[in-house]
Amino acid sequence: MEGLTDRQLEVLRFIASQIEDHGYPPTIREIGEALDIRSTNGVNDHLKALERKGYLSRDPVKSRALIPTSAAREALGGGGGDAGSNVVPLVRGPARPGSRMIEIPIVGRVAAGMPILAQERVEDTVQVDAFLLGTNKKVYGLRVQGDSMIGDGILPGDYVFVKKQLNADDGEIVVAMIDDEATVKRVYFEGDRVRFQPSNPRMAPIYVRHSDFRSTMILGVVVGVYRKLT
Protein backbone atom coordinates (compact mmCIF):
# COMPACT_ATOMS: atom_id res chain seq x y z
CA MET A 1 0.00 0.00 0.00
CA GLU A 2 1.19 3.51 -0.84
CA GLY A 3 2.80 5.31 2.07
CA LEU A 4 1.63 8.50 3.77
CA THR A 5 3.27 11.88 4.01
CA ASP A 6 3.78 13.33 7.47
CA ARG A 7 0.88 15.72 6.92
CA GLN A 8 -1.46 12.97 5.74
CA LEU A 9 -0.56 10.87 8.77
CA GLU A 10 -1.26 13.88 10.99
CA VAL A 11 -4.71 14.30 9.43
CA LEU A 12 -5.47 10.60 9.76
CA ARG A 13 -4.34 10.56 13.38
CA PHE A 14 -6.55 13.56 14.20
CA ILE A 15 -9.61 11.92 12.62
CA ALA A 16 -8.99 8.71 14.56
CA SER A 17 -8.48 10.58 17.83
CA GLN A 18 -11.73 12.52 17.39
CA ILE A 19 -13.63 9.28 16.79
CA GLU A 20 -11.97 7.81 19.87
CA ASP A 21 -12.75 10.81 22.08
CA HIS A 22 -16.22 11.74 20.82
CA GLY A 23 -17.56 8.73 18.95
CA TYR A 24 -17.81 10.51 15.58
CA PRO A 25 -15.33 12.06 13.11
CA PRO A 26 -14.55 15.78 12.78
CA THR A 27 -15.83 18.08 10.06
CA ILE A 28 -13.53 19.41 7.36
CA ARG A 29 -13.54 22.80 9.07
CA GLU A 30 -12.58 21.26 12.42
CA ILE A 31 -9.67 19.43 10.80
CA GLY A 32 -8.43 22.67 9.25
CA GLU A 33 -8.68 24.59 12.52
CA ALA A 34 -6.96 21.89 14.57
CA LEU A 35 -4.08 21.36 12.14
CA ASP A 36 -3.73 24.97 10.94
CA ILE A 37 -4.70 24.17 7.36
CA ARG A 38 -5.99 27.50 6.10
CA SER A 39 -8.49 26.42 3.44
CA THR A 40 -11.13 23.72 3.20
CA ASN A 41 -9.69 22.90 -0.22
CA GLY A 42 -6.39 22.11 1.45
CA VAL A 43 -8.09 19.76 3.89
CA ASN A 44 -10.00 18.14 1.04
CA ASP A 45 -6.78 17.51 -0.85
CA HIS A 46 -5.42 15.54 2.11
CA LEU A 47 -8.69 13.62 2.53
CA LYS A 48 -8.77 12.72 -1.16
CA ALA A 49 -5.21 11.46 -0.94
CA LEU A 50 -6.04 9.34 2.12
CA GLU A 51 -9.06 7.92 0.31
CA ARG A 52 -7.09 7.21 -2.87
CA LYS A 53 -4.39 5.42 -0.89
CA GLY A 54 -6.96 3.27 0.89
CA TYR A 55 -6.72 4.74 4.40
CA LEU A 56 -10.07 6.52 4.50
CA SER A 57 -13.63 5.86 3.39
CA ARG A 58 -15.76 8.93 2.66
CA ASP A 59 -19.39 9.76 1.98
CA PRO A 60 -19.37 13.01 -0.05
CA VAL A 61 -22.93 13.84 1.05
CA LYS A 62 -22.14 13.90 4.78
CA SER A 63 -19.57 16.23 6.29
CA ARG A 64 -18.69 13.86 9.14
CA ALA A 65 -18.59 10.61 7.16
CA LEU A 66 -14.83 10.08 7.43
CA ILE A 67 -14.18 6.44 8.28
CA PRO A 68 -10.62 5.12 8.80
CA THR A 69 -10.12 1.74 7.12
CA SER A 70 -8.37 -1.34 8.50
CA ALA A 71 -5.22 -0.12 6.72
CA ALA A 72 -5.50 3.12 8.70
CA ARG A 73 -5.72 1.21 11.97
CA GLU A 74 -2.54 -0.66 11.03
CA ALA A 75 -0.78 2.58 10.07
CA LEU A 76 -1.73 4.09 13.42
CA GLY A 77 -0.56 1.05 15.35
CA GLY A 78 -3.92 -0.70 15.72
CA GLY A 79 -2.87 -3.87 13.90
CA GLY A 80 -5.23 -6.14 12.07
CA GLY A 81 -6.34 -9.73 11.79
CA ASP A 82 -7.72 -11.51 14.85
CA ALA A 83 -10.07 -10.39 17.57
CA GLY A 84 -7.46 -8.72 19.73
CA SER A 85 -6.49 -6.32 16.96
CA ASN A 86 -10.05 -5.07 16.54
CA VAL A 87 -9.90 -3.01 19.74
CA VAL A 88 -11.53 0.41 19.81
CA PRO A 89 -12.81 2.52 22.69
CA LEU A 90 -16.46 2.38 23.61
CA VAL A 91 -18.69 5.42 23.60
CA ARG A 92 -21.76 5.59 25.81
CA GLY A 93 -25.08 7.23 25.13
CA PRO A 94 -27.43 7.23 22.14
CA ALA A 95 -26.10 7.30 18.60
CA ARG A 96 -26.32 10.70 16.93
CA PRO A 97 -28.93 11.05 14.16
CA GLY A 98 -27.38 10.52 10.73
CA SER A 99 -24.20 9.01 12.15
CA ARG A 100 -22.83 5.54 11.42
CA MET A 101 -22.79 4.72 15.13
CA ILE A 102 -24.87 1.74 16.20
CA GLU A 103 -25.92 0.76 19.70
CA ILE A 104 -24.96 -2.65 21.05
CA PRO A 105 -26.62 -4.15 24.16
CA ILE A 106 -24.35 -5.39 26.94
CA VAL A 107 -26.22 -8.42 28.26
CA GLY A 108 -23.93 -9.63 31.02
CA ARG A 109 -20.48 -11.03 31.65
CA VAL A 110 -18.46 -13.97 30.42
CA ALA A 111 -15.38 -15.66 31.81
CA ALA A 112 -12.01 -15.75 30.13
CA GLY A 113 -10.93 -18.20 32.81
CA MET A 114 -13.24 -20.43 34.79
CA PRO A 115 -16.75 -20.48 33.29
CA ILE A 116 -19.34 -18.21 34.89
CA LEU A 117 -22.98 -17.63 34.23
CA ALA A 118 -23.76 -14.98 31.61
CA GLN A 119 -26.89 -13.16 32.72
CA GLU A 120 -29.32 -12.67 29.84
CA ARG A 121 -30.44 -9.15 30.60
CA VAL A 122 -29.39 -5.81 29.17
CA GLU A 123 -27.12 -4.10 31.69
CA ASP A 124 -25.96 -1.25 29.49
CA THR A 125 -25.62 -0.14 25.89
CA VAL A 126 -22.57 1.14 24.06
CA GLN A 127 -22.08 2.50 20.58
CA VAL A 128 -19.46 1.80 17.96
CA ASP A 129 -19.00 2.77 14.35
CA ALA A 130 -20.94 0.44 12.06
CA PHE A 131 -17.93 -0.18 9.81
CA LEU A 132 -16.17 -2.08 12.60
CA LEU A 133 -18.87 -4.75 12.63
CA GLY A 134 -19.39 -4.97 8.87
CA THR A 135 -22.59 -6.79 8.00
CA ASN A 136 -22.99 -8.34 11.44
CA LYS A 137 -26.42 -7.32 12.70
CA LYS A 138 -27.25 -9.73 15.54
CA VAL A 139 -24.47 -8.64 17.86
CA TYR A 140 -24.43 -8.33 21.63
CA GLY A 141 -21.73 -7.49 24.15
CA LEU A 142 -20.41 -9.36 27.18
CA ARG A 143 -17.99 -8.05 29.79
CA VAL A 144 -14.92 -10.23 30.23
CA GLN A 145 -13.66 -11.53 33.56
CA GLY A 146 -10.47 -13.56 33.89
CA ASP A 147 -7.26 -13.70 31.89
CA SER A 148 -7.28 -16.99 29.98
CA MET A 149 -7.59 -15.21 26.60
CA ILE A 150 -4.87 -12.60 27.05
CA GLY A 151 -2.88 -14.20 24.23
CA ASP A 152 -5.60 -13.00 21.86
CA GLY A 153 -5.64 -9.50 23.33
CA ILE A 154 -8.80 -10.11 25.38
CA LEU A 155 -8.15 -8.57 28.79
CA PRO A 156 -10.14 -8.53 32.05
CA GLY A 157 -12.71 -5.73 31.89
CA ASP A 158 -12.86 -5.71 28.09
CA TYR A 159 -16.10 -6.25 26.22
CA VAL A 160 -16.37 -8.95 23.60
CA PHE A 161 -18.88 -8.34 20.85
CA VAL A 162 -20.51 -11.59 19.83
CA LYS A 163 -22.37 -12.48 16.64
CA LYS A 164 -25.28 -14.74 17.52
CA GLN A 165 -24.94 -18.10 15.79
CA LEU A 166 -25.02 -21.76 16.78
CA ASN A 167 -22.00 -22.94 14.79
CA ALA A 168 -18.36 -21.99 14.42
CA ASP A 169 -15.37 -22.84 12.27
CA ASP A 170 -12.37 -24.63 13.68
CA GLY A 171 -10.14 -22.21 15.58
CA GLU A 172 -12.65 -19.38 15.94
CA ILE A 173 -13.09 -17.55 19.24
CA VAL A 174 -16.52 -18.38 20.60
CA VAL A 175 -18.73 -17.85 23.59
CA ALA A 176 -19.80 -21.32 24.69
CA MET A 177 -22.21 -22.62 27.30
CA ILE A 178 -20.65 -25.54 29.18
CA ASP A 179 -22.53 -27.10 32.10
CA ASP A 180 -24.91 -24.13 32.13
CA GLU A 181 -22.06 -21.64 32.43
CA ALA A 182 -20.57 -19.35 29.80
CA THR A 183 -16.95 -19.04 28.78
CA VAL A 184 -14.96 -17.52 25.90
CA LYS A 185 -12.39 -19.77 24.21
CA ARG A 186 -11.11 -20.90 20.82
CA VAL A 187 -12.94 -24.01 19.65
CA TYR A 188 -11.34 -26.99 17.92
CA PHE A 189 -13.18 -30.07 16.67
CA GLU A 190 -10.92 -33.09 17.19
CA GLY A 191 -12.42 -36.42 16.24
CA ASP A 192 -14.32 -37.74 19.25
CA ARG A 193 -13.97 -34.56 21.31
CA VAL A 194 -14.29 -30.78 21.14
CA ARG A 195 -11.53 -28.67 22.68
CA PHE A 196 -12.16 -25.19 24.09
CA GLN A 197 -8.69 -23.70 24.19
CA PRO A 198 -7.51 -20.67 26.23
CA SER A 199 -4.71 -18.53 24.81
CA ASN A 200 -3.03 -18.09 28.20
CA PRO A 201 -0.39 -20.86 28.33
CA ARG A 202 -0.90 -21.19 32.09
CA MET A 203 -4.52 -22.28 31.59
CA ALA A 204 -5.75 -25.76 30.69
CA PRO A 205 -8.24 -26.42 27.88
CA ILE A 206 -11.78 -27.65 28.47
CA TYR A 207 -12.71 -30.88 26.69
CA VAL A 208 -16.20 -32.02 25.77
CA ARG A 209 -16.85 -35.46 24.30
CA HIS A 210 -18.26 -35.23 20.80
CA SER A 211 -21.21 -37.38 21.88
CA ASP A 212 -22.03 -34.79 24.56
CA PHE A 213 -21.54 -31.78 22.30
CA ARG A 214 -24.67 -29.95 21.21
CA SER A 215 -24.93 -27.07 18.76
CA THR A 216 -26.59 -25.02 21.50
CA MET A 217 -23.26 -25.00 23.34
CA ILE A 218 -22.09 -22.32 20.88
CA LEU A 219 -23.76 -19.01 21.75
CA GLY A 220 -21.90 -17.00 19.15
CA VAL A 221 -18.60 -16.07 17.54
CA VAL A 222 -16.51 -13.17 18.84
CA VAL A 223 -16.27 -10.48 16.14
CA GLY A 224 -14.52 -7.78 18.16
CA VAL A 225 -12.91 -6.84 21.44
CA TYR A 226 -13.72 -3.40 22.78
CA ARG A 227 -12.27 -1.29 25.54
CA LYS A 228 -14.29 1.50 27.11
CA LEU A 229 -12.93 5.02 27.41
CA THR A 230 -11.29 5.95 30.70
From Swiss-Prot:
Residue(s) at site: Cleavage: 112-113
Catalytic activity: Hydrolysis of Ala-|-Gly bond in repressor LexA
Keyword terms of this UniProt record: Autocatalytic cleavage, DNA damage, DNA repair, DNA replication, DNA-binding, Hydrolase, Repressor, SOS response, Transcription, Transcription regulation
Active site annotation, chain numbering: 148 (for autocatalytic cleavage activity), 185 (for autocatalytic cleavage activity)
Keyword Ubl conjugation appears in the UniProt entry: no
Biological role: Represses a number of genes involved in the response to DNA damage (SOS response), including recA and lexA. In the presence of single-stranded DNA, RecA interacts with LexA causing an autocatalytic cleavage which disrupts the DNA-binding part of LexA, leading to derepression of the SOS regulon and eventually DNA repair.
NCBIfam families listed in its UniProt record: lexA
Family: Belongs to the peptidase S24 family.
Protein's name in the database: LexA repressor
